Every structure is written in structure tokens, then in C-alpha cells.
Amino acid sequence: MNAPEILNGAATASPADATEATQTAARAKTPLTRREQKEAYENNKLFKRLARQVGEAIVDFNMIENGDKVMVCLSGGKDSYAMLEILMRLRERAPINFDIVAVNLDQKQPGFPEHVLPEYLKQLDIPFHIENQDTYSIVKRLVPEGKTTCSLCSRLRRGILYRVAGELGATKIALGHHRDDILQTLLLNMFYGGKLKGMPPKLQSDDGKNIVIRPLAYVKETDLEKYAELREFPIIPCNLCGSQPNLKRAEMKALVRDWEKRFPGRIENMFNALSNVVPSHLMDHKLFPFAGLRATGEADPQGDIAFDEEPCSTDAAEGAMPGATKSISIVQFDDL
């Protein structure tokens, strides 16, 4: 996509006409109270921020191209609802043509409200497909009682969605993972997997046949929570299967939330670090040729300053005011 055009579209888009209070007042031709005006302003600002961030992610990673058919995976949770609505709004103003089809996988979990998503999608007047597959029975049969079923369930779901994408002729599969999901995955892999690995905004599927995109990659979960409350999405609970929660991921989520609250700027810096990788200062010899490294006798502006204190830019440092900079010593001579 063309960056200026789609981002301009994001800036001018607005939610389904802000809040109920705004709509009611407009119909009645009565002036808004100061509180209602403030709420309408904040809600509109929230949508513009979400649309801008989604537009930026699409542009930065070339997620959607002219002629694409994007299969939006709709689970019934706040993230996928918001993703679908924002993509629909951006499409109205995008400089390219692309189609959207919403897909939900009904896994036959007990108590799953089968009517909710079809009714909602019919109101949106958007093409959709409900795939009925009883993966619930398979998972319950194979996973011991009390164990987390999420891993097997996700593998089954992934295979089904890849197949459905092929049947529908989808060229991109859109998932609703957001910024916090990406950081939680990074921490999980570091703490429990021994890998410096996150969750990419765009990837080729493991079967080699699909391109998976995450348009919400730049979006904070707290913003999605506010937006879902504003839009009153018909949220479907994610615990219908009765599985035990993923305690490790819950731990990472709590950690990220705590850091963001207590140390303003820390989480944003962590997220920015994913886009500013320096392989020569890590330890993966597959990414950098340490074995063949030799002194050339010529100055290298990118060379290491091993005996100096390395300054950190802290424009968004913990507790710092925007625009402030401060040098933080991260290498002490006692450590050398």
C-alpha cells in the first residue's frame, strides 16, 4: 500500500459514529453536554489512533497488496472484532482494491452461542464463512483431564484455517494478535524456551502455502479493551472449552502490565527493540561471522566501544518526559 494515502485514510476514518450519547443527541437536535463532548472527542481520537497504527503496520510490512483477498479470522473476542472493523474502514479509503472475508471456526465447544457471529456479520453486510469442525471432542479425548488443551487445539485450528483459506481463494490470513501478544511471546521464548524469538507481523505459514499477517501488531491491548467497550462488540468467552489457563502466558501478561504501569516507556522501548536488532552484539554465530572477525587496522564507525560506557537513548525512557534524553551507563568497568 501507499503509505501517505492509507495513513491519511486512517486519520479521517471514524467509528460507527462515536458513542450512543452522540448519536442520541444528534437525532434529538439537542446540544451535547460538556461530558458527552469530551467522551465523543476521546472516542474519536481512540479510533483514529487504532486506524493509524493498523495502517502503519500494513504499510511497514506490505501486509496487503492490490487484488488481495484477506481472510479475517474472527474468534468472537475483542481483538478480532476490532481488526475486522478497522480493516473494513481502511478499505473504504485505501488506494488499492482488496476483498475481505470473515471466517469463524466453530469447534463445537459446549455452550458456544452459534447465532452470535452470523447475526453480527450479516449486519455488517460482509462475506463470511462459518467452518464447523468438532475439534473439541478430539482435544478432550487426547488431552488428560486438567491439562492445558490450548497447544493441541491451536494446531488443529491452524490446519483447518489454512485449508479453508485455500478453499476460499484467500491470499492473506489476518490474525488478531496485538503488541502485547508479541511482547509476551518474546518473554515466554526467552524465559522458558531459551530463544530470542517473538511473533512476526508477517510470515509464511509452516505449510508454505499461506501468508499470515497481524495488522494489530502496533496496537496496545488496553486500547483494544477500550474500543471493544465503546463499540459494545458481542464478545464470546474464550473459556468455554473448560481448559486450564496458560499460566506461563498469564504470568507474562501480568508482568508486561505491571511494567507498563510502574515504568512508563519501558514496554515501548522493549517493543521498539524488536525493530532495532544488532546481530554483532548478540551471540548467534549463525547471524554474525564471529569466527572470521579480524582487526583490519581501519577505523569502523560501527565498531564496538568495549571500554566505554555505552549511552542509551531514552526519549521514551522510564519515567522520562517526551523529548527528554539521558545517558544511562549499561557497562561498568568492574564487569570487564
UniProtKB/Swiss-Prot annotation:
Cofactors required: Mg(2+); [4Fe-4S] cluster
Binding site for [4Fe-4S] cluster: C150, C153, C241
Residue ranges annotated as motif PP-loop motif: 75-80
Low complexity: bias regions: 10-22
Subcellular location: Cytoplasm
Subunit and interaction comment: Homodimer.
Misc remark: The thiolation reaction likely consists of two steps: a first activation step by ATP to form an adenylated intermediate of the target base of tRNA, and a second nucleophilic substitution step of the sulfur (S) atom supplied by the hydrosulfide attached to the Fe-S cluster.
Family (UniProt): Belongs to the TtcA family.
Role, per record: Catalyzes the ATP-dependent 2-thiolation of cytidine in position 32 of tRNA, to form 2-thiocytidine (s(2)C32). The sulfur atoms are provided by the cysteine/cysteine desulfurase (IscS) system.
Protein name listed in UniProt: tRNA-cytidine(32) 2-sulfurtransferase
Organism: Paraburkholderia phytofirmans (strain DSM 17436 / LMG 22146 / PsJN)
Gene: ttcA
